[in-house]
A protein has these predicted regions:
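Phosphate/nucleotide-binding beta-alpha loop and adjacent structural elements of enzyme active sites
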Residues: 1-171
Length: 171
């Protein structure tokens, strides 16, 4: 499993018993400190950084002043926080990608193209704030639909997509 927007570990804590290995990403130093202390599990690999479609260094900001709304500052060209791609993890398997990264989900999905094609994981994303980075919900949907995914559930601001082979699609 790959999870981004780890915050203080609340989401990951719920997944620990269900996945052999969980990679969780959190860029904010204070949140990451809490995450490390809240998740002492050996199957959780904690990475202080962001997910993107390329390796780079970024700055983060808290536009609303709270620890749950951290996002990449698009006005700063180079920062101190590393970005990684999911594909570079070279996973042996991946059953779930869960992204809550304040509108940067499309970039993380682009950086997971090979992982998505190889493993067809369930994908759960927060479905808001895309416009901050020049993307939108249509771009996210088109990317997932073109890779064989269908929307299977909505919960508040989250969307869950499941891979369905083209030959098994009804529509």
């Amino acid at each position: 499993m790959v999870q981004a927007g780890g915050n203080c570990g609340m989401h990951v804590h719920k997944f620990v018993e269900h996945f052999d290995t969980i990679y969780t990403f959190e860029p904010d130093p204070l949140n990451f400190f809490c995450l490390v202390n809240n998740l002492p599990y050996s199957n959780v690999i904690k990475i202080q950084g962001c997910l993107s479609d390329e390796n780079k260094l970024v700055e983060i900001e808290k536009p609303y002043g709270d620890i749950g709304s951290i996002r990449i500052n698009k006005n700063v060209k180079q920062g101190k926080i590393p970005c990684f791609t999911i594909d570079e993890l070279k996973l042996d398997h991946c059953d779930l990608i869960q992204l809550d990264i304040e509108g940067y989900e499309m970039f993380a999905l682009r950086g997971a193209k090979e992982t998505i094609k190889k493993f067809h994981p369930l994908i759960c994303i927060e479905y808001v704030h895309f416009q901050h980075y020049g993307t939108d919900n249509k771009e996210v949907d088109n990317f997932l639909f073109s890779n064989g995914y269908e929307l299977v559930a909505k919960y508040v601001t989250d969307r869950i997509y499941k891979y369905v082979p083209f030959n098994l699609r009804i529509s």
